[in-house]
From Swiss-Prot:
Highest classification ranks of the organism: Bacteria, Pseudomonadati, Pseudomonadota, Gammaproteobacteria, Lysobacterales
SMART domains in the record: EXOIII (SM00479)
Gene: orn
Gene Ontology MF, one: nucleic acid binding
Name by which UniProt lists this protein: Oligoribonuclease
Annotated catalytic residues: 132
Transmembrane portions of the chain: none
Function (record text): 3'-to-5' exoribonuclease specific for small oligoribonucleotides.
InterPro entries: Exonuclease_RNaseT/DNA_pol3, Oligoribonuclease, RNaseH-like_sf, RNaseH_sf
Source organism (scientific name): Xanthomonas oryzae pv. oryzae (strain KACC10331 / KXO85)
Amino acid sequence: MAENLAGNDRLIWIDLEMTGLDTDRDSIIEIATIVTDAQLNVLAEGPELAIAHPLETLEAMDEWNRNQHRRSGLWQRVLDSQVTHAQAEAQTVAFLGEWIRAGASPMCGNSICQDRRFLHRQMSRLERYFHYRNLDVSTIKELARRWAPTVANGFAKSSAHTALSDVRDSINELRHYRQFMGALGGDTAMDVEG
């Protein structure tokens, strides 16, 4: 358990797997979280939870999601699960409460705005646990792709498409980009013309 939850620089990393990308119609089927320190060292892994849904819900997914979630094993885990959205939210909030105070961490991950939209609708208490800011690794990836393609191309994800593996990938990807950010001179202010 955390010795002091107030005023820390810990980061909450999260990933969701969903039945699709439509935040009004689709649903969260898996959630995982990791807490790191500011230097991206893993402090704790939260519960990795498949959320119960009926077979009809899974069969209604598009082909990509059906194939991916069967291949990863998530399909069967969802069918076998007894965990509801409310239980997954409560377990995740309880875990986070041991490591970081509410409102202290931005929501961290890849394409995290999409996760935030799903959380707002289906797990609003958990969504409110985060600071309003996001630490979205995909923003850095998009900038690197345009400004430093060799840096962007130097990282390969595992692409397992499970929530926990995707959280780990996000942390590792930011570690990759951080190597190149050191070339900026740390805390040294940069001169900007204009």
